[in-house]
Structures are given as C-alpha cells and as structure tokens.
Amino acid sequence: MELGYLALVLHAHLPYVHHPEFPDFLEEDWLYEAITETYIPLLRVFENLTNQGVKFRITISLSPPLLSMFKDSLLQQRYLGKIEKLIDLAEREVERTRWLPQFH
C-alpha cells in the first residue's frame, strides 16, 4: 500500500550582483559561494544517485537573475579566478600546517 509521495522542490535565487566596472566586487562572492557550496554539490549528488540506479524526481526553479549571472562570461571568468585562488590558498595552508599533526 502506498502511503504517499514526497515532493522535493528547490528554489534557487540570488540578487543580480554583476559589476563589470570593478575588478573585484564583494557581493559577487555570494554567487561564487553558492556555485561552489550548493549548486555543484547538488549536481554531484544527482549524478551519484543516477550512477547508483536510484530513481528520483526533483523540481528546481532557477530565478531569472541567477540564470543571467550563470551565463555571463565575465562572471564565469571571475569564478574560475576565485577557484584558482582558493586552490592556491589550500595548497599554502597544507604547506603551512605540514608539521602540525592535528591538521592532517
């Protein structure tokens, strides 16, 4: 006997924060953090579920400002730059804490 259904509905929105007049704009970090900490991990979960043969359904709504920022080539380039900086920082932190066993 079926007891019911669970509907997952995710809504993604961020305010439009594109500022080409500045090389680095703090509010753009909201987008970069959301991509890194939310959207990419969600896609990985969906991919893993699919690879494991799990049948799932999900509804995702993406706001027009968010979609506009996703497709903006300048924001894409800036995001890649932010990721490169994070990788560099992580590598330097590993080196800095190499001799501290509580960090490894």
Predicted regions and their residues:
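N-terminal regions that are enriched for targeting/export leaders
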Residues: 1-56, 69-104
